[in-house]
């Protein structure tokens, strides 16, 4: 019985922590047509409070980097990798034993997508990220992405 209670407390605490990290970052998406069959997909993270979100290239082992994974779509071609647009902070963090790269308040991630034909489709996938403040880190979170393009 004692083990069941401890397990339930652990599960509840984990669920609350994941919910906190999803509230710490709000995602907005926008699509801009660059040329015929070429689109710029912007994925903007608005980071609340004193939290910071780690970059795609964190700089050290330890904190979870931001990772975008897109679902294969036979109608699209990803042109290059996701680019970060924002003011990166490079700071030594003793807990990680080195210099880390992260963003405060906001960062925009940009992916260029080319369509194989003039059709309406979507860019789908997920983004995994981790946020911390000066006192704590929240568990890594995963948010689904679905952005309509073309047409």
Predicted regions located by residue number:
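Bacterial Sec-dependent N-terminal signal peptides
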Residues: 1-23
């Amino acid at each position: 019985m004692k083990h069941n209670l401890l397990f339930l407390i652990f599960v509840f605490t984990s669920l609350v922590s994941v919910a906190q990290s999803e509230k710490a970052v709000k995602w907005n998406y926008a699509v801009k047509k660059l040329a015929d069959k070429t689109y710029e997909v912007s994925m903007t993270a608005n980071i609340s409070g004193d939290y910071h979100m780690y970059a795609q290239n964190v700089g050290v082992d330890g904190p979870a980097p931001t990772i975008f994974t897109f679902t294969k779509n036979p109608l699209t071609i990803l042109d290059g990798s996701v680019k970060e647009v924002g003011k990166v902070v490079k700071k030594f963090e003793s807990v990680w034993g080195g210099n880390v790269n992260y963003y405060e308040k906001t960062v925009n991630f940009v992916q260029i997508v080319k369509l194989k034909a003039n059709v309406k489709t979507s860019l789908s996938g997920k983004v995994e990220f981790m946020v911390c403040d000066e006192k704590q880190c929240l568990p890594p979170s995963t948010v689904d992405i679905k952005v309509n393009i073309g047409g």
